Amino acid sequence: MSVRPAASFSPTVGVHSTHPTDMPEDHAALPVWNAENWFYEDFEVGHRIRSLRRTISEGESMQFNALVLDMHPYVGDQMFAEREGMFGKRLVAGAFVFSAGLGLVATNCVNAFSYGYDKLRFIKPTFIGDTIYTIRTNLAKTPKYKDLGLIRASYEVFKAEGEIVLYCEHIQTVRYRDPANVSQGNE
């Protein structure tokens, strides 16, 4: 599989407004930030992107734990983690690493929605204070329905030093620009 150089891929700054009627007209006319209008045909297998980095703080880790009711001693009890835990310090909940890691490369593609996730693995522990980043790679395209195809992408979350901590594959259902052309295999 060849990887397309990032420089040849035009980034999306925003999609044209849908002109919502419940805000000032001059605001409603602006392009939408962090939104894409890509269709199935626009996704290229092998295309890769890397996110910015982010450091996971104790506060946000504990907020997430409280929100999802995850109070396992490894993520919520400093004394247990230091004295009895196998890592000697508190972990960040895997569900938070998953959420934050995918969020780092998330965009709002108006022609796509999530079909599901496969192969989710927590490969190495992530600790409070660790800095992470994510690499997304488009793995496959599969025509599926009359108006929609499936895009499979891998998400690899790394610590700042390059150690992988999480892997998963996300399947998205994406609208065809021209269903007749895709269904005939002529993309």
List where the protein language model places each region.
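Hot-dog-fold acyl-thioester-processing enzymes
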Residues: 2-115, 177-187
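Intrinsic-disorder/low-complexity, polar/charged segments enriched in Ser/Thr/Lys/Arg/Asp/Glu/Gln
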Residues: 38, 44-51, 131-133, 150-152, ...
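A short acidic/small-residue loop/turn micro-motif
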Residues: 56-57, 140-141, 172-174
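A structural signal for short, well-ordered beta-strand segments
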Residues: 52-54, 136, 155, 168-172
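Surface-exposed, gly/pro-biased binding rims or lids
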Residues: 158-187
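Hydrophobic beta-sheet segments that form the core/acyl-binding groove
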Residues: 116-160
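Short acidic, gly/pro-rich beta-turn/loop elements at beta-sheet edges
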Residues: 61, 130, 144-146, 161-165, ...
